[in-house]
């Protein structure tokens, strides 16, 4: 792995062989994280060399992803409702298909004078945190 382009090709092939359905995309996200870049910045400069530290981080991420760890756990974070949340195996990964529910709660809470929101079965807390960020005056409890 001398440059980013070669690293991505090798990683995508390894992930495909491991049964990863989004092999190329996952490789891009992991390499961007390893290099401390946005995915867009990475893609705009694929000919750049990898430092030894970047290559080591990328290799560690790749091993975990090839072993079946979810990408969000490998990266240690995920996006939900426009916010970044830390993420690991202690809680379920906040999912994009939960965002419409969260948006409905925010809309409903915004229409109330003194809203109270209770999230039962909170895992990561991403729903409650997102509601509180959107409705700072709401009393939000996660249990």
Predicted regions located by residue number:
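Conserved SAM/SAH cofactor-binding pocket of Class I
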Residues: 96-143
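A general structural signal for well-ordered alpha-helical segments in protein cores
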Residues: 8, 27-28, 58, 71, ...
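Secondary-structure transition/hinge residues
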Residues: 16-19, 35, 66, 109-113
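Secondary-structure boundary/capping signal
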Residues: 19, 23, 38-39, 70, ...
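Non-catalytic accessory regions of SAM-dependent methyltransferases
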Residues: 1-43, 48-50
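Conserved AdoMet
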Residues: 29-107
